Amino acid sequence: MSAKEVKFGVDARDRMMRGVDILANAVKVTLGPKGRNVVLDKSFGAPRITKDGVTVAKEIELDDKFENMGAQMVREVASKSADAAGDGTTTATVLAQAIVREGGKAVAAGMNPMDLKRGIDLAVEAVVADLVKNSKKVTSNEEIAQVGTISANGDVEIGKFLSDAMKKVGNEGVITVEEAKSLETELDVVEGMQFDRGYISPYFVTNADKMRVEFDDAYILINEKKLSNLNELLPLLEAVVQTGKPLVIVAEDVEGEALATLVVNRLRGGLKVAAVKAPGFGDRRKAMLQDIAILTGGQAISEDLGIKMENVTLQMLGKAKKVMIDKENTTIVNGAGKKADIEARVAQIKAQIEETTSDYDREKLQERLAKLAGGVAVIRVGGATEIEVKERKDRVDDAMHATRAAVEEGIVPGGGVALLRASEQLKRIKTQNDDQKTGVEIVRKALSAPARQIAINAGEDGSVIVGKVLEKDQYNYGFDSQTGEYGDLVKKGIIDPTKVVRTAIQNAASVAALLITTEAMVAELPKKGGAAGGMPPGGGGMGGMDF
């Protein structure tokens, strides 16, 4: 075990504070509509330009181990805010820096760090309660567009795309962001359920121009196993022929004589049929087939349930108003499933999303949820250069998460004003002793930091702006740094999602309180000389050889 270096008290906190400042100062220049860009060097390819706080924070790694510990803890604030609300990362970083700075001074003046922490916790509770009380529900598309515009650093086009996407796929629908190959940004909406499997054979195609299978009012057979034996399929095929309706078979695979017979019947026109491989693998495939069954009002045929293929009846099949299958995707529109069944399945998937610890599983569950709940919207972000597209995509991602958060918990006035107003409530908090009172005061001072920083980034005097805003007693009154005017921020469309502001202050205070209560730090000693160990002096040639 290598030797360690240990720092105590003021020395430890000073080194840590230096790291916090380096990271926070790099991140906070991006805050607000007039925030600046940060250029990130990449080991390969062109540098990356971004205005996204968490992207900047993730790139920062400091040489000094003690400074780096401070920086990494504040980086955690940005990451946690991004995970919980998808935005507010810069605000959270600015708040954490302000609380740590004021808290550090209080500890250096001889106050009890644990009482300071209790005071900070009391203050945060009061701030959250005030935010929730003054939160306003988002109802119109205009408000959704405004939230998107603010979060995308004032880009009106992005706000409009997001509100259109949410209008089309609903609040539960999935919105994915991709890089476009063109200059224009565009929105593409897939209604109904789509999965990434196409037809097994091109002979099933009904629309030769588009190379697509298009069926109206179709039956859907959902089978977990391979189908190769014709005899087990025959009873069902005969029953479907009698109805005159088309049949879509979703199975692990269709091969051999079963596939040959389906193709021949399709070509002769005796049976409108198409076969598709089941999506996913393993347990996920089972779950997705069950989703399709619930959406279409059918039953997933599985040997686990003791149902044999030859015993399948028309009542076990799903139904859909329209099914489209191309080479790569299958889309089922207007399935005949019962609304109550679909809602129960949606609730079940939501519960799984809450429980899972894996990001990959969460992403896949959210995709399944969207397919059941409404559809998928894809925003393809365009731009003149790859660097511009990447920078814009970062902003669209932020804006998408912010609009989701706004729909979930409502909105408050933006520009750091909601936190400024909450700071006025902290004067009334009762504490047990003076140190706790100082803890509350630390948070009260820190709450003006985001509004101050937005003004500074716009070239204004932060203290003057904060003073003028607090003079007026209207909750929504604030400073619009884009135009340099004061007024009702909600009417001007300058709004923040309550969830974003709430998670920013909670995460910032949580990590900052830990930094304030730190008394010792332990890190490995830097290696002396920097040479790798291993070879003895003198080259270490083979014994007995004289070169």
From Swiss-Prot:
Instruction: Tell me which residues bind ATP.
Output: 30-33, 51, 87-91, 415, 496
Places the protein is found: Cytoplasm
User: Which InterPro entries does this chain map to?
Assistant: Chaperonin_Cpn60_CS (IPR018370), Cpn60/GroEL (IPR001844), Cpn60/GroEL/TCP-1 (IPR002423), GroEL-like_apical_dom_sf (IPR027409), GROEL-like_equatorial_sf (IPR027413), TCP-1-like_intermed_sf (IPR027410)
What are the EC numbers?
5.6.1.7
Provide the Gene Ontology terms for cellular component: cytoplasm
Coiled-coil region list = none
Write down the top EC class of this protein: isomerase
Q: Do you know which PROSITE patterns this protein is assigned to?
A: CHAPERONINS_CPN60 (PS00296)
Going by the UniProt record, its keywords in alphabetical order are:
ATP-binding, Chaperone, Cytoplasm, Isomerase, Nucleotide-binding
Q: What reactions does this protein catalyze?
A: ATP + H2O + a folded polypeptide = ADP + phosphate + an unfolded polypeptide
Q: Which GO terms describe its molecular function?
A: ATP binding; ATP-dependent protein folding chaperone; isomerase activity; unfolded protein binding
Which PANTHER family does the record cross-reference, listed alphabetically? 60 KDA HEAT SHOCK PROTEIN, MITOCHONDRIAL (PTHR45633)
Question: What does it do?
Answer: Together with its co-chaperonin GroES, plays an essential role in assisting protein folding. The GroEL-GroES system forms a nano-cage that allows encapsulation of the non-native substrate proteins and provides a physical environment optimized to promote and accelerate protein folding.
Record protein name field: Chaperonin GroEL 1
